[in-house]
């Protein structure tokens, strides 16, 4: 498991906990393969080189506003410079509905010093959705019912 070599904000009391990082990536439900994962009722899910959460609050609290549309995207290979692009596709709709989202660095940080993108993943309607995050070489695919 690669340990990220990113700098925390100047003066930050945080430090990356390498053991917690490794454990997090090895134990989060999902797959290390680059394929779509059904989120189901799980809160944090891994697909490829991304872990995304909190799906539970996102789904239960959704009302179409940015305030209730926050998801954290944790890349396996953060570098501190790469933007995050998320393609959200409403599955089973005609015509197909696609929302393209773009989020730049800087990251936010967990208490364990793990970098993540904070986003307002605003989706316009309920239904079955596929999220495909891409940041540099990191990719993932998550399907869930909103």
Ranges and model annotations:
Residues 1-124, 128-146:
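Contiguous segments within soluble domain cores/interaction surfaces
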């Amino acid at each position: 498991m690669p340990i990220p070599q990113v700098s925390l904000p100047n003066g930050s009391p945080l430090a990356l906990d390498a053991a917690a990082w490794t454990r997090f990536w090895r134990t989060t439900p999902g797959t290390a393969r680059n394929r779509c994962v059904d989120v189901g009722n799980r809160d944090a899910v891994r697909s490829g080189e991304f872990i995304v959460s909190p799906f539970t609050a996102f789904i239960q609290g959704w009302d179409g506003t940015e305030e209730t549309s926050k998801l954290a995207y944790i890349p396996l290979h953060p570098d501190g410079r790469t933007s995050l692009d998320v393609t959200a596709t409403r599955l089973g709709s005609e015509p197909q509905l696609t929302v393209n989202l773009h989020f730049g660095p800087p990251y936010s940080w967990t208490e364990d010093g793990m970098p993540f993108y904070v986003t307002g993943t605003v989706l316009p309607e309920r239904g079955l959705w596929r999220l495909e995050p891409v940041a540099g070489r990191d990719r993932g695919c998550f399907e869930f019912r909103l």
